[in-house]
């Protein structure tokens, strides 16, 4: 399992993002990650959190992860968020879920001209990279997310961070939650709502 959190703000999103992700720490014990977009473009950090909590691993990265929009995750599986450059532009992506027809989708990607995927231990492909490959088969992020949800058998909720904003897509059967919160000058999207309700000034949309 895992959880994700995203923030779009008129001012710095970094601390809200940091604490929002940290509130999901009970959902995963292997990897944590943050990606932000600011004046310098995209910045990202991923750490192993098997032997120490998210907060202590990422506290030292916060000065470098400065921006007004960001996404991040706690993951029990793959390292993420990923940074991607495609015909849609540069973006960051993080996911929560399971792809049951992974082998079929990978085979189709090769047949359609997708050159390669980065292989992980024991021959696994990062599921988030596969989702990005599906999105990139279409001509817009909206169409790409709809296409990915249509093709994936299983359950997959997705956050995509672009220079223009954050796209959030709940898995099409509603098995996993995606909730939206707000405070003055900022919106957030979260796997679990207490991640923003526990932060002062935030409420449901």
Write out the residue ranges for each language-model feature.
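Conserved short alpha-helical segments that host acidic/polar catalytic motifs at enzyme active sites
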Residues: 1-202
